[in-house]
Amino acid sequence: MTVGRILPAAGLVLALIVSGSCGSSPMSPGPVTPPVTAVNTPPVVESIVASATRAEVETDVTITATVRDAETPVAQLKYEWRADAGTFTGEGASVRWRAPKGAPTPADYAIRLTVTETYSASNAVGGSQQNIVNATSPVIRLHDSPKELGDLSMSFLGDFANSSVSPSTCIRDFSDSCRGKADEKADIEWNREHFVVVGSSLRLQNVTVGANGMTGNMSVACRFTSRITKCEPGDSGCAVGAVGTVAGDCRLTAVYEQQRWWLCSSNFDGAQVPGFRSFFSSKPK
C-alpha cells in the first residue's frame, strides 16, 4: 500500500510515501539446502582362490579372498567362512579349510564367504550402519581315496561272486581307457558260462595311492566256492556238478579320470585247483 499527501506551502510540495504490501514480511528466509549425505559403497569380493581344486579328507586347503573397499581398510572388515562340511583355521581374508574323515565323497564342496563392513552413518539418524556382501568359491573336489578304492574293489568282487549279476554290470566301474575292462568282461562271461558261485568271502587287505594321486593298487583276500556247470571238450580234469574252492589274493589296479576313481585291471594270485584252473579266465596263467 502506498499513501501520498500533498502539503501546500509556498510552492513547496512534499510527498510522504510509505511503501509495503499487506501480509508481507520485510525479511523472508530463502530456500534451505539439506546437508549432503555421503554414500558408503559396499565391499567388493574380487575373487576367492583355493590352493587346490582336488583335496583329500583330513588335509588342509588354503582359501584366500581378494577384497577391496573404498572407505574401510580390508583388514577391518569382518569375514565369515562356511562350508557344508569341515572346519576352518585362521581368520580374515585367508583361512585353511579341512574336511573331516567320514565326509561324503567323492563330492564337490564350495566355500562360502560373508564380508561385513560396519561404519558410522553421517546423517540425522547417526549410529552404525552395515554393508553385507556374499561370495562363493569355485568348487573343490573332495575325496577319501583309500576308502573309495576299497569300496570299488569290494563292490566289483561282490558282484563277481554273485552269478546272477551280468558281466556288463560287473565291469561298470572299469575305465574305458584300460584294456583290463575288455579282458575282465571276457573272463566273467567265461565264468558265468562254466561255473555257478555258491559261496564266497572277501577281505580288503591293502590300498595304496600313487604319489601323483592318479593311480591306485588294491589287494583283497578272496575265496570262492563254485559248482561246475559246463566242461570244455578235452578237459579231462573237469566234471560237471563238481564243487571246489579257489582262494588267494585278488589284486586290482585303478586310475583317476573324470574327477573320480575307476578300476583298471583285476588278477588272481593263488593256488590252482584241479578242475577249477579256468575259474577266473579261459586262459589260466
Language-model regions: role of each:
Residues 73-80:
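Solvent-exposed loop segments of extracellular immunoglobulin-like
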Residues 43-44, 149, 261:
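Proline-centered linker/hinge motifs at extracellular inter-domain junctions
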Residues 167-222:
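Short solvent-exposed beta->alpha transition segments
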Residues 213-285:
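Exposed beta-sheet edge and beta->alpha loop/turn motif
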Residues 16-47, 52, 137:
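Bacterial Sec-dependent N-terminal signal peptides
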Residues 135-162, 172:
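Short, low-complexity N-terminal intrinsically disordered segments enriched in polar/charged residues
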